[in-house]
Structure formats: C-alpha cells, structure tokens
C-alpha cells in the first residue's frame, strides 16, 4: 500500500489529464453497457409493435446511437493519445529524478553497486512503470465500471441466476489473489536477472580490447550464457505462474457460460425466465468477462510496473552519504592552504582502518607528494579533500574551513583532479576540454590546450578541435588523452590541485611531455601529488611516506634520503 501511495504522487502534475481520462473511460464503458439494455428494451416494447411504428422509430434511434458512438470514438482517441502522453511524461519525470539521484549519490554507493543494474533501472524498469502509469488506472477503472454495471444488469434481469455468478466471481478473486503473490516474486527475480545480463554485457563491451587481447572471448561467452540461462530459468518460473493464473481464470470464465446455459435453461423450463432474457444475459456475461480478461493482463503489467517502481524507489530513497550540511556556506576567496588534523578513516561497510590519526599541513601555493605501497591510503587521503568520502575522525580543512561545513559545489569547484584513469566523454576534443569550464570561449579552450602541450597535435587533425574522440577517448593515445584532461584542469583554473599518479601509465616520451604540462599546471597552486616514479616528485616542498594507515616518514627529498628509511629504500629500487 505504501508503494502505491508513493506511485500515485507522480500523477499530481497531470491530475487534470488524469481525471479527464477517467471521465472518457466512464463514457466509453457506459455506452458499451447501455447497448444490450437498449436492445432488450426495444425487443420487448418497440419491436413487438406494428411495422410502421418500428420503421419510424429507427431514424431517431440511428441518430442517437451514431452520436453516442462518435462521442465514444472521441473519448477513445483522448484516452489513447493523452493517456499515453501522461504516462510518457511521468516516465520522463521519474527518469530525470533517477538520473539526478545518480548524480548525487556518493562514491560509496558506486563502490557497492553495478552500473549494469543501474542502467536497467533507468531504461527497462521505467518503461514498464510508464505502461502501468497510463494503462493501470484507466483499465482498472473501465473494468470495474463494466464489471459492476454488468452485474447490476444481471441482477435486474434475473436475481436467481446472478447468485451462482457471484459465487464464481468470489472463488475467482480468491484464486487470483494467491497467484498474484507468486507472480510478484517471480517478476522481481526477472528484474534482478535482466540486470545481471546488462552488467555482464556492459563489462564485456567496455573491456572488449582486454577480452580480445587475452583471447578470452569463450570465457566471456560462458559468463554471459550463465546470466542468460539464469534469466531463462527465472522466466520459466514466471511463465508457470502466469500459465496457472490465466488458465485458472479462463476456467472460471467458462464456468460462467456453463452456469448461464444450464441454470438459465432450468429457469426457462420452469417459467421463471424468458428466452430473450437469457440471450441478454449471455451478452452481459460477455461484457462481464471482457474486463476480467483485461484485469488478467493488467495483473502482469501491474506486477512488472510495481516491481520496477520498487527498484526505482530503492535508488531515489537512498540517502547520499555526502551532502551539504544544514549550515554549509560557500567557499570564497580561496588562498589554498590545506590541513589534515588527526584524520582517521574506514569505509562504511568495513571497520578495518584505512587511515589512522593522519596530520599534516600544506601552506597555500606549496606542494607535497605522497609515496608508499599500493593500498596504503594515498588515494584515500586525496579523496577526503573534495569530500568524495567523509573522515571517520578528525577533520580536513581548506583555508581553515572544515570541508564538511562548505557547500559541495563551491568546494569541488576550487579543486582540480588529474588521475591516471583518464575519462573522456563521447564527443569532440573541444567539448572535452570545455568540460572544465562549460561556458569557456574558444580562445580560452585553445589557451588551455597550449598550456597542456596538446594544441599542436590537435591542429594536425583534419577536424582540429571538432575531432570526435570516440567512446572514452578510444581514438587517442594514453598521452594524448592525459594532456586533454590536463587542459581541462587548466581551463578550470583551481587554486588546489590533486595529481593522482597522472603519469604512471605512460611511456617515457609521453611522460616527459606530461610532466612538463603538470609542472606548468602546478605553478603557484597548492598541489598534492601521488607518484610511484620518485623522479617526478623530487622538487616537492615536502614528501610524506604513507604506510601502515599513517605517515611513516616526512621531509624533503634530501632529508628523507639522509634518514635512510623507507623512502631511501624506494629510491634505491627505482634507480
């Protein structure tokens, strides 16, 4: 019931269309219900009279019915067009809400959830929700009107024959309720299994170069086939439930005709019913059964739609871990001093400490470098500054302001990030550079490209800055992609910079180009650099050696070599 209440609120912006839609549905149903009763009345009164009287009455009857069917046709058009558009607009609204929520959710959510499942919720689930949004209330309303209306007429025609019909309807409702619960479980399982297929497909397509380079196509096919077979098994269980549901309802519908024929014949034989009334009874049984068949189909649609809506709610009702505090203020006039005060951190789903009582300061415009083994917490330290995660204990401050007391937008707009995992969007080189400042002029984009040492390469391309980079920048080399990402940060022009192993995946020649760009980028900015190649950080104002959840050593390059500890050992190994 709570799910239905939440679903109904999405009708609110379209309540006028919704109520007109229901009014049109009422008119359609009323005309369908009125015709057999009109025919019964005419058969017993007018058509039993003189031929001349019958012929003279046909003209007004024809005009009246023609007007009624024209009105019904107009109502059907409105229900079909406006009703579907209402569902499509609700789907649009939900898709926007879901996408906006994906944009708000914290890194911890993406650490624990699969993007294939998220895509399934954004596309497949919302399509089923849209179908339910339009057809659900309309079909339910029409069906109820026809069922109730036809039953009233059945009682009016012959009460004795209506009693066994009522008993059959009650038995059918009890049967349908039991089958519905089973179908709901199988539809939810279907959703999960199709999400698994999407996940498997996305993994394979995103990593197709790795798959083919290792000649592991067969392994990926086997993984996909397992997901595909699991979906088939889930569908099998679903269709078994549907088969029982639909065949059971068809049996009860057949019983209604059987009872009408046998019990009606018995009543006619005993003079308690006229043969013409039995014919009308059969017509109303047809009108009664038709909406039942619609409700049977609606049950499948409702289970799909509500299952999708529950999955939709799972996302939109998830509270992001990282949000603006109630008293958050914008970060202004940034100088760039950074301070980590007794910082400890562990992930929300794991109590194992990643950082323990880490403290250091970076004066504005100065640079520090973080070195240490993989998994020691270097990237985690950097992730706490723009609040990709929040500290468990202690605080991180910029210009003396606790980052948790600042608005996320103002904080992150002052921090530039260049990482080894470069992500370029499917578009042009110009679009990707301009991502750092969406309203940038062409001159600003070119200037940023020149500073990143990528302008000359771009000008050699046939389409220059309008060159399409391919999905994730597949048409460019690693070094070219990295320089575009650096140009993006030049354009953003932040006072604080994070360089997360920005050259670790590059060859020596590309690294020299990139290193020159990075040095230009870091000039007069507060910079945190993570590097495995120690030659790239020798000139840092301070180097921190991160190990065992904390800072094991700190000092300049020369001081750490003189200390002859962990850093000195790393340096010797790198030579």
Describe these PLM feature segments.
Residues 98, 102, 211, 312, ...:
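Helix-loop junctions and hydrophobic alpha-helical segments within the transmembrane domains
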Residues 2, 11, 79, 83-87, ...:
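Juxtamembrane loop-to-helix connectors within ABC transporter transmembrane domains
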Residues 18-78, 155-160, 271-275:
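Transmembrane helix-loop-helix hairpins at lipid-water interfaces of multipass membrane proteins
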Residues 331-575:
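ABC-type nucleotide-binding domain
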Residues 13, 17-27, 65-68, 138-189, ...:
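Transmembrane helices of ABC transporter permease
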Residues 193, 216, 240, 288-315:
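Cytosolic ends of transmembrane helices, especially the final helix of ABC transmembrane type-1 domains
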Residues 107-108, 124-133, 137, 141, ...:
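An intracellular "coupling" helix at the cytosolic face of ABC transporter transmembrane type-1 domains
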Residues 64-72, 76, 169-173, 242-256, ...:
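Hydrophobic alpha-helical segments in the permease module
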């Amino acid at each position: 019931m709570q799910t239905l209440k939440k679903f109904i609120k999405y009708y609110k912006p379209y309540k006028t269309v919704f109520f007109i839609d229901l009014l049109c549905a009422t008119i359609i149903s009323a005309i369908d219900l009125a015709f057999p009763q009109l025919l019964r009345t005419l058969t017993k009164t007018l058509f039993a009279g003189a031929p001349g009287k019958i012929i003279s009455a046909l003209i007004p009857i024809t005009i009246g019915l023609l007007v009624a069917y024209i009105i019904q046709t107009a109502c059907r058009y409105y229900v079909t067009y406006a009703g579907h558009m209402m569902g499509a607009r609700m789907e649009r609204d939900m898709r926007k809400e879901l996408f906006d929520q994906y944009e708000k959710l914290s890194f911890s959510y993406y650490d624990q959830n699969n993007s294939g499942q998220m895509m399934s919720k954004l596309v497949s689930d919302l399509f089923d929700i849209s179908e339910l949004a339009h057809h659900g209330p309309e079909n339910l309303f029409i069906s109820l009107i026809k069922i109730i209306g036809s039953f009233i007429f059945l009682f009016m025609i012959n009460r004795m024959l209506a009693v066994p019909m009522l008993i059959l309807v009650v038995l059918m409702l009890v049967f349908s309720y039991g089958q519905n619960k089973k179908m709901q479980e199988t539809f939810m399982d279907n959703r999960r299994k199709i999400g698994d297929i999407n996940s498997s497909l996305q993994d394979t397509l995103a990593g197709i170069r790795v798959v083919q380079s290792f000649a592991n196509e067969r392994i990926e096919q086997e993984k996909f086939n397992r997901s595909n077979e699991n979906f088939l098994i889930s569908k099998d269980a679903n269709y078994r439930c549907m088969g029982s549901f639909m065949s059971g309802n068809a049996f009860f519908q057949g019983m209604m005709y059987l009872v009408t024929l046998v019990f009606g014949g018995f009543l006619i034989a005993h003079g308690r019913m006229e043969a013409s009334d039995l014919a009308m009874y059969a017509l109303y049984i047809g009108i009664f059964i038709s909406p039942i068949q619609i409700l049977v189909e609606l049950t499948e649609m409702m289970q799909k739609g509500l299952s999708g809506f529950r999955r939709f709610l799972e996302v939109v009702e998830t509270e992001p871990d990282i949000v603006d505090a109630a008293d958050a203020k914008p970060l202004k006039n940034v100088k760039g001093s950074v301070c980590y005060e007794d910082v400890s951190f562990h992930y929300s789903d794991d109590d194992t400490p990643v950082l323990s009582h880490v403290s250091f300061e970076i004066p504005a415009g100065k640079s520090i470098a973080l070195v240490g083994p993989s998994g020691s917490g270097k990237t985690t330290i950097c992730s706490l500054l723009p609040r990709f995660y929040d500290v468990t204990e202690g605080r991180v401050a910029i210009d003396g302001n606790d980052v948790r007391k600042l608005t996320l937008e103002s904080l992150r707009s002052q921090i530039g990030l260049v990482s080894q995992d470069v992500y370029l969007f499917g578009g042009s080189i110009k679009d990707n550079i301009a991502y750092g400042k969406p309203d940038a002029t062409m001159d600003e984009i070119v200037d940023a490209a020149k500073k990143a040492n990528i302008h000359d390469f771009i000008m050699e391309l046939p389409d220059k800055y309008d060159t399409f980079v391919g999905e994730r920048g597949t048409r460019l080399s690693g070094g070219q992609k990295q320089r575009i990402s650096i140009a993006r940060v030049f354009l953003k022009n932040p006072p604080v910079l994070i360089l997360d192993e920005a050259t670790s995946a590059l060859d020596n020649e590309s690294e020299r180009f990139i290193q020159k760009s990075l040095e230009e980028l870091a000039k007069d900015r507060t910079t945190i650099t993570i590097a495995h190649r120690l030659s790239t950080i020798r000139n840092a104002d301070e180097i921190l050696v991160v190990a065992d959840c904390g800072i094991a050593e700190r000092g300049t390059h020369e001081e750490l070599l003189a200390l002859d500890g962990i850093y000195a050992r790393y340096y010797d190994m790198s030579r």
